[in-house]
Amino acid sequence: FSFHHRTDWVNNTLSYGSGYASAFIEWASNVADTKFRFSEQAVRLLIDYYLDGICKQMVYGRISDPGILNRDITRPGEERVWSSSDPEKLRNLTDYRQAELDNIICLRKGDSSCRPGSFAKFFWRTDHFVFQRPDFYTSVRMYSTRNANMEEPYNGEGLMNHFRGDGTNYLSVRGDEYKRLTPVYDWMKIPGATIVQLDKMPGENEIQKWGLTDYVGAVTDGTYGAVGLDFKSPHTGL
């Protein structure tokens, strides 16, 4: 599961996509004991989206994967620990995948007795690959002819995001390694990306570009995986 707010198919799972889920979670919780309650099938779909879409694009299900941030990377607090409110509400709706919801709740509350799970997942519509073990989380952000590299700099945010989709590979052990990095970031030295070092960054109208190659692909059995990208920079031709 992934969420796309616009026709550029940029990954918005943890921005608009989380708000989308939260609205349904709130109403499912509000009407749970009435004749308007959501069907079990609908609740299960919502839980699947929350656990397999939202939580698996987060470091240990607690903190946003820095690799999927768009213009919101410039906002203070994006490295915060997410609230346990939504998974708690979901847990009260059904016993479906309850152990996994309990683990997310426990992790977000900072209980040291909880251990993050292990998984490898490819979000094929988003061209995003994630890999987690109990002691680290890493991801690879890519794009192809099917989607754009980055969100437009709406509201004057993310003005230096030109190269952040170019195979970016962030590694997190605690989850807060990139906290408050944005003001001092070298935007032409992005982890995992091969970037031509320019004299100055292109203008803000040159941030969003569509991929020039078709191939981004991965194989995974849910625990192990491999991912590949046929990359050609739409900014520099590299």
Language-model regions, residue ranges each:
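Active-site lining segments of carbohydrate-active enzymes
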Residues: 1-37
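Extended polysaccharide-engagement surfaces of secreted carbohydrate-active enzymes
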Residues: 20, 27-238
